[in-house]
């Protein structure tokens, strides 16, 4: 490993890969991510991060002030393999004290106002 010889740890390589991947994902949002971002999240009165690295995961949207993660799920997330990955990911995020809201892309397309209201309630009306 040339990187290790040059004094770069495997952890740093992993983090760089995640960082590069997050940057790529921010540049290539899905139609539903763009809709939620440009038509709702970016104008909220609190900071919303897109494609945020948390641990070894990249979450779609993260609101630190509300300890809230928002994930938009395409059809692949309904496959058994993806569901197991999502369960593991959600368990880690919950162990960090975060709340996870998951919405199917179809929900964004068919009930956008309802999704926005649900997110608003979790941010501003939490107990």
Q: What do these predicted regions represent?
A:
Residues 2-127:
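Nucleic-acid endo/exonuclease domains
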